[in-house]
Amino acid sequence: MRPMASKEAQLEALLYAAGDDGLETDNLLQLLEISPSALRELANHLKDRLKNDENSGLQLICINHTYKLTTSAECGDVISKFFQKDLSKNLSQSALEILSIIAYRQPITRVEIDDLRGVNSSGALQTLVWRGLIKVNGKKDVPGHPNLYVTTDYFLQYFNYESLADLPVIEEFEADDNPVNLFDQDEQNSKEINFDEGE
C-alpha cells in the first residue's frame, strides 16, 4: 500500500491542481485538516524549499490570503519568451477548446470550465492568459471567490473579429455533430473543435 503523502506534499499538489486561481487559506485548512499555524509553517517550509532549490523554477506566493504556485522571477525571461515569441503558432486543441468556452460563456471560472471539459484546464488557461487572449475580470461571489475569465480585445484582433457578435452562433451547429469551427482556419491556422454548450 502506498504511504500517505506528507502534508507539505499535499499542499504542493493542491496548489498545482488549483492553477492560476490558487487556494484561499480557509479552503486549504479544510482540505489539509490542519490548524492555521500549521498551514503557515508548511507554507513557509515549502516556500523556502522551492527558493533554495536551484533546479526548481517555481515559487510559492500568498496574496490576499490566497496561496499560489507560480514561476519564479529568475525564470521570467524564458517564460516570457516561450509565451510571447510566436503568437501565430497554432494553439493546442485544449487551448482552443477553453478559448471557445470562455468566448461563449464569459465571465466564467476555471472550475466551471473544468466541469464542461471534464479535465483540469489550469495549464492551457495560463497559456491563454500569458498570450493575452484572455484575462481575469473580477471574482465570482461564491465560496473561495474564484477568478472570472473573459476574452480580451487582443482575442478579437488575433482571430480577426470586430466583436464577439461575429462568433459563429452555436445553434447553427446543433442540428448535427459537426465540430464547431470558431476561428478562421486559413488565416489563423486554428483547428476545428467540438464545443458542447451544455444545458
Curated annotation (Swiss-Prot):
Q: Where is this protein chiefly located? A: cytoplasm
* Gene Ontology cellular component list: cytoplasm
GO BP of this protein: cell division; chromosome separation; DNA replication
Its localization reads: Cytoplasm
Keyword line: Cell cycle, Cell division, Chromosome partition, Cytoplasm
Q: Which Pfam families match?
A: SMC_ScpB
Record-annotated disulphide pairs = none
According to the record, the segments passing through the membrane are none
Superkingdom assignment: Bacteria
User: How does the record describe its quaternary structure?
Assistant: Homodimer. Homodimerization may be required to stabilize the binding of ScpA to the Smc head domains. Component of a cohesin-like complex composed of ScpA, ScpB and the Smc homodimer, in which ScpA and ScpB bind to the head domain of Smc. The presence of the three proteins is required for the association of the complex with DNA.
Protein family (similarity comment): Belongs to the ScpB family.
Function, as annotated, reads: Participates in chromosomal partition during cell division. May act via the formation of a condensin-like complex containing Smc and ScpA that pull DNA away from mid-cell into both cell halves.
Q: What is this protein called?
A: Segregation and condensation protein B
Gene name in the database record:
scpB
